[in-house]
């Protein structure tokens, strides 16, 4: 249904088919991963946040452009991230990875993003250090708290929207 809606919108409006993007967090991120598996040539780039999927069908991601952001203390998403990294490295992908605290000042996080982008990889992985996404005095799961931090990374958003299909 979502893909039919996308096709209808692209068909109706003046939208550049070379600049379609997907992003999602948790189950929405899982859908973005699935869309990239099922339709490998649809998106110019993707942003996956706090999600995972069976990486055995992700070998073609070696040609994709994406950021994948998780919290280290998330119970599932880092496992999916590591599985995808393993698949990509088996295909000699030049992946870029970084880890930092989500409690760093935003300017420092943006500098970390720029350092990661400067590595020139198509596949970029960011991990927020365990315990850093849960605000002081709050409880809950790192999975849920990681989303806001991921989407506050302006450099990641800017990178995403600079991408176009080649």
What are these regions (language model features)?
Residues 67-70:
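Short beta-strand/loop motif that positions the catalytic acidic residue
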Residues 72-78:
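Acidic catalytic loop of the alpha/beta-hydrolase fold
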Residues 82-90:
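Short, aromatic/basic amphipathic alpha-helical patches
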Residues 1-27:
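Gly/Ser-rich "nucleophile elbow"/oxyanion-hole loop immediately N-terminal to the catalytic nucleophile
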Residues 18-63:
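Primarily recognizes the serine-hydrolase "nucleophile elbow" in alpha/beta-hydrolase
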Residues 7-14, 37-41, 89-94, 161-165:
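Sec-exported extracytoplasmic/periplasmic mature domains
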Residues 94-166:
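C-terminal catalytic histidine-bearing segment of alpha/beta-hydrolase fold enzymes
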Residues 1-8, 30-34, 38-41, 79-83, ...:
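Extracytoplasmic/secreted proteins, especially bacterial periplasmic and envelope-associated proteins
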């Amino acid at each position: 249904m979502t893909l039919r809606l996308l096709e209808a919108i692209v068909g109706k409006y003046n939208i550049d088919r070379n600049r379609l993007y997907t992003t999602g967090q948790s189950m929405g991120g899982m859908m973005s991963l699935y869309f990239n598996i099922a339709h490998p040539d649809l998106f110019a780039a993707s942003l996956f946040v706090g999600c995972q999927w069976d990486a055995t069908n992700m070998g073609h991601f070696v040609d994709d452009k994406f950021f994948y952001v998780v919290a280290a203390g998330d119970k599932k998403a880092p496992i999916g991230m590591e599985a995808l990294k393993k698949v990509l490295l088996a295909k000699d992908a030049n992946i870029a990875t970084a880890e930092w605290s989500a409690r760093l000042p935003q300017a420092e996080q943006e500098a970390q993003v720029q350092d990661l982008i400067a590595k020139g990889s198509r596949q970029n992985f960011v991990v927020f250090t365990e315990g850093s996404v849960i605000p002081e005095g709050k409880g809950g799961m790192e999975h849920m708290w990681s989303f806001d931090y991921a989407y506050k990374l302006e450099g990641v958003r800017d990178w995403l929207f600079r991408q176009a299909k080649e």
